[in-house]
Amino acid sequence: MNMKLNLKIYGALHFQCLLIIILTGIMSLNSYCQNAELNGTIAGWGTASYSDKLNSMLGIRFVPALTLNFPVKNKFKLDSEISLNTWSSGTFWSGDSTTNDAKIKPYRVWLRFSGDHFEIRAGLQKINFGSAVMLRPLMWFDRVDPRDPLQITDGVYGLLGRYYFLNNANIWIWALYGNNNPKGWEAAGTWPHKPELGGRVQVPLLSGEIAATYHFRQADFRAYNINDSIYFPDPVKENRIGVDGKFDLAVGLWFEGVLIRQNGIKEGWQRYLNLGADYTFNLGKGLSLMTEFFSLSSASKAFIRDDGISFAAISVTYPFTIISSLNAILFYDWKNNDLYNFVNWSWQFDKWSFYLMGFWNPDRFQVYPGMNKTNLFAGKGIQVMAVYNY
């Protein structure tokens, strides 16, 4: 127990030291900064929902961001971003109980060196890719919820390099370190002090593009009960392969497929598939329709049939005016015969945005990772949000 505690403390201190080194490097360049820009987002919201009982929440979020640009000779560019994710909320449960939550944590802390056809970015950053929109098999390093007006998601610590060819092909290479908590669809985090490596190649094809992606890590399943089939005491080598493509034909079409192998796990093969399409109808100011089919399954072999989950998703968007639009998103769980409903009426101004949202969901929200427990967005409810961007 003491050794585990010491490892956790060491890992946390190691991580903080890494962040301090990056911040120190950025701030040491501050005297050479060509220009600095401070911007950010302030959002306040209120939610009322009913599942087994009436619950409500009030909250505020502040995401300040400092962008720095440094002069570099020739055609190169050196810039950085430092931002925080701060929030405070109070949840009021019917009865008398109240739960308060508040946190301040780094959101983005990175330094980037770039040229006309390449970029190298180091630090706490957002890395996402793929063709799908609502249910994304390639959601490996983020947890963006398409219903969230702020599109908030944690970043990952790592080094990312990208090269862009003249024909719009591009190559990505990354190395991640210190991301011990689960991310994306992961059921378990990464083993402490073990790096993650991967890359992606994307090339134009016909009227669109196609890509192949690979990632390797060593997963940590020790948090599970020792009697659980997914428990494993040692680092689990995990290899991921993904392919995706998007094409602009009479309608927009895309696909994403992922195959994951976890050595030593009983059901160590995972398969993800997404097929999607979108089209804008010439009705009024333009009615946009998007639909996706998503499936996820685990098995002891790569391509045998086994139990899993599958969802169908539909998104409809209609702009009433230049500043006002209505969006509806529906998910259908084929296995449990559950229907998830979400409606968002938004108003967009220069600096202000307002949202009126309604949802009608099962008591247990099971669409996205990290939301498998009963939460405030389960059941039926409404949410209002005001956002100020400066």
What is each of the regions a protein language model found here?
Residues 33-51, 78-80, 169:
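Transmembrane beta-strand segments of Gram-negative outer membrane beta-barrel proteins
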Residues 44-50, 84-88, 115-117, 124-128, ...:
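Transmembrane beta-strands of outer-membrane beta-barrel pores
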Residues 347-353, 360, 376-390:
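Outer-membrane beta-barrel "beta-signal"
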Residues 36, 74-78, 117-120, 168-172, ...:
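Repeated loop/turn-to-beta-strand initiation elements of outer-membrane beta-barrel proteins
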Residues 64-70, 108-113, 159-163, 199-203, ...:
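Residues on the lipid-exposed face of transmembrane beta-strands in outer-membrane beta-barrel proteins
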Residues 207, 246-332:
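Detector for outer-membrane/organellar transmembrane beta-barrel domains
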Residues 54-62, 102-107, 153-157, 193-197, ...:
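Residues that define the transmembrane beta-barrel architecture of outer-membrane proteins
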Residues 69-171, 176, 203, 363:
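Outer membrane beta-barrel
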